[in-house]
Amino acid sequence: MPNKALITGFWSKVKVDEVGAEALGRLLVVYPWTQRFFEHFGDLSTADAVLGNAKVKAHGKKVLDSFSNGVQHLDDLKGTFAQLSELHCDKLHVDPENFRLLGNVLVVVLARHFGKEFTPELQAEFQKVVAGVASALAHRYH
């Protein structure tokens, strides 16, 4: 179980709109096969196009708003993400591996934004959280 106080204290400093936009943008650039779920977002042909895309930024914020909800409910991630798991499995048919990839990209973005403040101890705690969220989102697939 992650250290709740450490996670929630740090998370309160995160600018969800900026970090969410960058995390989703990086996911789409670093793992371009994930773009197939976002073809309706328009031009995703280059890194600059992806990172400057208003729909990517807006959806990144939406994703991180949901993640923020998970941070507030670390004891019940499966329940917190049950509806999103159902949506991504049954309707969108998203490969559950993408949840793990996004979690890892999120950790990279947090490290980039917070530098030395994102200590190895904090990273270890966040790895637990992103793994828990990825597992909760993949729950419907099992």
From Swiss-Prot:
Keywords: Heme, Iron, Metal-binding, Oxygen transport, Transport. GO terms for biological process: hydrogen peroxide catabolic process. Heme b binds at residues 59, 88. Disulfide bonds: none annotated. Red blood cells. The keyword Iron applies. GO terms for molecular function: haptoglobin binding; heme binding; hemoglobin alpha binding; metal ion binding; organic acid binding; oxygen binding; oxygen carrier activity; peroxidase activity. Gene3D superfamilies: Globins. InterPro entries: Globin (IPR000971), Globin-like_sf (IPR009050), Globin/Proto (IPR012292), Hemoglobin_b (IPR002337), Hemoglobin_oxygen_transport (IPR050056). GO terms for cellular component: blood microparticle; haptoglobin-hemoglobin complex; hemoglobin complex. It holds the Pfam family Globin. The keyword Heme applies. Belongs to the globin family. Involved in oxygen transport from the lung to the various peripheral tissues. This is Hemoglobin subunit beta-C. The gene is HBBC.
